[in-house]
Amino acid sequence: MSNQRSSLKHLNTFALPAYASNVISAGSVETLIAAWHESKAKRQPVLLLGEGSNVLFIKNFSGTVLLNRIMGITSTEDSAAWHLHVGAGENWHQLVCHSLQNNMPGLENLALIPGCVGSAPIQNIGAYGVELKQVCEYVDLLDMDKGTIQRISAEECQFGYRDSIFKHRYGNGFAIVSVGIKLMKSWTPTLGYGDLIHMDPLTVTATDIFNSVCTMRRSKLPDPMVTGNAGSFFKNPVVSAAIAEEIVHCYPNAPHYLQPDGSVKLAAGWLIDQCSLKGYQIGGAAVHQQQALVLINQSEATGQDVIHLARYIRQQVAQRFSIWLEPEVRFIADNGEVNAVEHLS
């Protein structure tokens, strides 16, 4: 480890010890392109990183970590909607605050999601009944080899549950430089999850929802500035109606959410909790005491500690429910991202 130059501990919210050959902060498209070509000339891999809130470094990275810090928020409006053009390096929660302060509701359910705006389309971030795909108008994508920018429409992004085209076709060699957000003026509240279900849809305001979401998240999720974590570690599994019916029959209180295609989304945190794993620890990594979906850096954890813990959790849930959880967090090895499911199998 010591022969590599740049520590990544402060650049990942898990606060795991890892190193890279080099770290470059890029505040412009030109810097992104120059750093990309310099690394290619050296035959070094490049990792594009936002705020490091959804990554797990399982090894030292052998190349350059490129921090996307392209900033700026501009807005226009027409009779139907507000249109925001947002730099990829902007903090997501600050964008939510900015929109509400300027009386543009629509992002309030997505408050306090960690990370930057450029990472939001990659994961199709979502919380409390709202996903990015519902408000995304376009994504401006840089081809770092060619030096060209193309605008990808929301439809072309192929958004799925914590998935998009940016994890596949537009992965390596591409960088999101800005995101277009469309907020409809005919705002209606989304109140189907958590404490929001107790709110009156006729009188509730976007600020009410924002405050409630912030309260819920702060009560359940550890602050990464205090306790290293990457938020929800696993995706909520989507299963067939038949499997869900079987589980609900055995566990009537099991949280379950019918999807438009007839499948059912289950709560991964609840599944883990049923295995009595809150507080369970391997090495320096542990399951959070309040929210079983969150794995934490309890005490100088390493990436391998987290791997061992995640693997054990998957095995326990599969043994009890015959459901294999998939990580939401991206696994980063020496040459870049690796398949998280394969790594845990």
Curated annotation (Swiss-Prot):
The active site is at R162, S232, E328. Cell wall formation. Pathway: Cell wall biogenesis; peptidoglycan biosynthesis. One of its GO terms (molecular function) is UDP-N-acetylmuramate dehydrogenase activity. Residues 16-186 form the FAD-binding PCMH-type domain. Belongs to the MurB family. InterPro entries: FAD-bd_PCMH (IPR016166), FAD-bd_PCMH-like_sf (IPR036318), FAD-bd_PCMH_sub1 (IPR016167), FAD-bd_PCMH_sub2 (IPR016169), MurB (IPR003170), MurB_C (IPR011601), MurB_C_sf (IPR036635), Oxid_FAD_bind_N (IPR006094). One of its GO terms (biological process) is cell wall organization. Its EC number is 1.3.1.98. It is found in: Cytoplasm. Keywords: Cell cycle, Cell division, Cell shape, Cell wall biogenesis/degradation, Cytoplasm, FAD, Flavoprotein, NADP, Oxidoreductase, Peptidoglycan synthesis. PROSITE patterns: FAD_PCMH. GO terms for cellular component: cytosol. Its cofactor is FAD. This is UDP-N-acetylenolpyruvoylglucosamine reductase.
